[in-house]
UniProtKB/Swiss-Prot annotation:
Listed InterPro entries: Clx_II_MBL, Glyoxalase_II_hydrolase, HAGH_C, Hydroxyacylglutathione_Hdrlase, Metallo-B-lactamas, RibonucZ/Hydroxyglut_hydro
Gene that this sequence comes from: gloB
Cysteine pairs bridged by disulfides in the record: none
EC number in record: 3.1.2.6
Role, per record: Thiolesterase that catalyzes the hydrolysis of S-D-lactoyl-glutathione to form glutathione and D-lactic acid.
Organism: Pectobacterium carotovorum subsp. carotovorum (strain PC1)
Record has Metal-binding as a keyword: yes
Protein family: Belongs to the metallo-beta-lactamase superfamily. Glyoxalase II family.
Claim: Hydrolase is one of the keywords in the record: yes
HAMAP family noted in UniProt: Glyoxalase_2
Protein's name according to its UniProt entry: Hydroxyacylglutathione hydrolase
Cofactor: Zn(2+)
Length: 251
């Protein structure tokens, strides 16, 4: 499988995953024109569109793409029916595409119906988990979002995290402010600062890396709890997550 990231809108990424037959899936097309350009550039034929949630910066290109590929199936959670999805998915479903299987994982929090697609080693997780961060909670609860991220956390270290926004540098600055003594975060902040100065992408990332530099995956650590609470032994992991997310919202 070959993975292509397409910069779109202000800071989005649209993902293409293709096989040896030059067939591909399009994940979260927030706009159509860069997708059409990439398909032409790489001589790819789309087999389906996969949607993670209903926000316009993830679905805004669907109708235009369907003008060019009118028989293209569009998969997504129930909340994307109004956005052009024709096959609605839920937890435990699998989708057969590219001579392969994509597993559907429900990850509510950012939106109430948000899903992710897993085709090892690739995870297309929309706005749930970002590099060094996580999505804002618009429709769900902090505990829901924490539990959704825990579903991702059990995947293997080599899982390729294909998230939908270039937020890595901002997330690392926040993490460094919370925990300035953490050498892994500080080193990666320096590395990503150099990458972004060259206007290069910081994505995709891997789950193994995120376990080290993403505080939202480290809510169980007592040292982090001490940073956030006067009673670190009495605070639950999801409450640590809630505190972090609240602080990030104001950062």
């Amino acid at each position: 499988m070959n993975l292509i990231s397409i910069p779109a809108l202000q800071d989005n990424y649209i993902w293409l995953l293709s096989n040896k037959e030059n067939r591909c899936v399009i994940v979260d097309p927030g706009e159509a024109s860069p997708v059409l350009d990439a398909l032409a550039q790489h001589a790819l034929f789309p087999e389906a569109i996969l949607l993670t949630h209903h926000h316009n910066d993830h679905v805004g290109g669907v109708h235009e793409l369907l003008k060019h590929y009118p028989n293209l199936p569009v998969f997504g959670p129930k909340e994307t029916a109004k956005c052009g999805a024709t096959s609605l998915l839920e937890e435990g479903n699998t989708v057969s595409l590219l001579n392969s299987e994509f597993s559907v994982i429900e990850v509510p929090g950012h939106t109430s119906g948000h899903i992710a697609y897993y085709n090892a080693p690739f995870l297309f997780c929309g706005d749930t988990l970002f590099s060094a961060g996580c999505g804002r909670i618009f429709e769900g609860t902090p505990r829901q979002m924490y539990e959704s991220i825990q579903k991702i956390a059990v995947l293997p270290d080599d899982t390729v995290i294909c998230c939908a926004h270039e937020y890595t540098l901002s997330n690392l600055r926040f993490s460094n402010a919370i925990w300035p003594e953490d050498q892994s975060i500080e080193a990666y902040l320096h590395e990503i600062s150099q990458i972004r100065e060259k206007s290069q992408s910081s994505l995709p990332t891997t789950l193994g890396l995120e376990r080290r530099i993403n505080l939202f995956l480290r809510c169980h650590e007592l040292d982090l709890k001490r940073k956030l609470s006067k009673e670190p032994e009495n605070i639950e992991n999801w409450q640590v997550f809630e505190m972090l997310r609240s602080k990030k919202d104001c950062f």
